[in-house]
Amino acid sequence: MLKIADKTFQSRLFTGTGKFSNRHVMAEALAASGSELVTMALKRIDLAQRDDDILAPLLSMQMNLLPNTSGAKNAADAVYAAELAREALATNWLKLEIHPDPKYLMPDPIETLLAAEQLVKQGFIVLPYCHADPVLCKRLEEVGCAAVMPLGSPIGSNQGLASKTFLEIIIDQAKVPVIVDAGIGSPSDAAQAMELGADAVLVNTAIAAAHDPIAMAKAFKLAVEAGRMAYESGLPSRVKMATASSPLTGFLDFVS
């Protein structure tokens, strides 16, 4: 069980809603993933229409919605988008995204921290997408964010956990849930994040862009469960030298 703010989740796999070929594939893939929390870009949905292609299936599935501020270029943009989302969707939950550079989509750490502090004061439950920067993640925690969402690698790049060393530090020092977001390109990447001790992962492109998104969603579901189970079971430490699992002496004496 994973608790974030006022909600408890059975699944530690959170999902995105972009890049699916159609709403039906999206709905089937989300169901196969077992995910209970989905994020969607405010700029991609019509908040005034409950039968919106993205919003309608999510509402019918009774998904927990995590609107995001993708497209915001600064703190002011993000706060404005958050207020619109809260009014239209009746939720205080928000994935805070501020990435002014359209090429690499790197999150702006300064604007993200400024927006997070303001949004928390306004009563939002803020989950900020950010660099895998241990200092920044600690600052976001200190201003009241309900979780932190450091990137594994650039959004949609499928490069996996390029930031592994820094993720380990963030996980070690965090007092709020750590959700690895962005760049997770395969189920093995998700399992690795969970083995490190991440509380959850958020996956979109790797599922939506797969040849069979529904099967891939199930693969991610199993990978996240396996990775978490491995972490909780206590993985053995890595060592430089070999350690035998069978006796190395006495064999000839035994058989002679």
From Swiss-Prot:
The active site is at K95 (schiff-base intermediate with dxp). It is an enzyme of class 2 (transferase). Pathway: Cofactor biosynthesis; thiamine diphosphate biosynthesis. Its EC number is 2.8.1.10. It comes from the Bacteria. Belongs to the ThiG family. This is Thiazole synthase. It comes from Vibrio cholerae serotype O1 (strain ATCC 39315 / El Tor Inaba N16961).
